[in-house]
């Protein structure tokens, strides 16, 4: 197979070669942002539907105890981005729907400063994404149904002083700061 598209194909110079997100063993090819962890799971079918693990004691990506579990939904075509926590780690799992989840490392002292990691997650291709503090993260529902995301943050939500910072995904500041478009 050649590495170039023949020049006889109209638009050949605009084409970019696709790179698989996984290698031949199924391992992720992407270089993860420092501190970001991902564990893919799989739905196991049975006669009444299917079952899949969301989190389990002993998984090395779950260093801290679960102190709160909540779910949030996102309507088709809608965004939940960009969020950041100063102290808390998010542990995100897509229980229903189809999401494009992105994480941006804006930490200037990080070895992966400027990196973006992107994941396509769904109930058919589930995974637990652990987002440490000080990383911008968010998602877009790219499916046709309402998506359900389960979060198991390392710190319970503080109603009086939430550790939640928002940079609207469609703001001029986000467009200038984060090199990613949903």
Put a short name on every predicted segment.
Residues 129, 137-142:
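Short beta-strand His + acidic residue motifs that chelate non-heme Fe in jelly-roll/DSBH
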Residues 123-131:
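Short, exposed beta-strand "edge-strand" segments with a Pro/Gly-rich flavor and a Y/T-containing core
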Residues 2-124, 142-182:
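Non-catalytic, conserved peripheral segments adjacent to functional cores
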């Amino acid at each position: 197979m050649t590495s170039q598209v023949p020049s006889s194909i109209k638009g050949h110079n605009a084409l970019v070669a696709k790179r698989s997100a996984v290698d031949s063993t199924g391992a992720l090819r992407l270089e993860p942002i420092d501190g970001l962890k991902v564990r893919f799971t799989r739905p196991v079918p049975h006669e009444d539907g299917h079952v899949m693990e969301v989190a389990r004691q002993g998984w090395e990506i779950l260093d801290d105890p679960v102190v709160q579990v909540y779910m949030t939904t996102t309507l088709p075509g809608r965004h939940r981005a960009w969020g950041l926590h100063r102290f808390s780690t998010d542990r995100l799992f897509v229980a229903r729907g189809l999401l494009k989840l992105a994480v941006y490392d804006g930490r200037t002292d990080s070895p992966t400063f400027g990196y973006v990691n992107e994941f396509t997650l769904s109930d058919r291709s589930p995974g637990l994404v652990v987002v440490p503090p000080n990383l911008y993260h968010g998602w877009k529902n790219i499916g046709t149904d309402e998506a359900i995301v389960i979060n198991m943050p390392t710190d319970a939500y503080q109603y009086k002083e939430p550790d939640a910072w928002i940079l609207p995904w469609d703001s001029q500041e986000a467009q200038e700061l984060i090199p990613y478009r949903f």
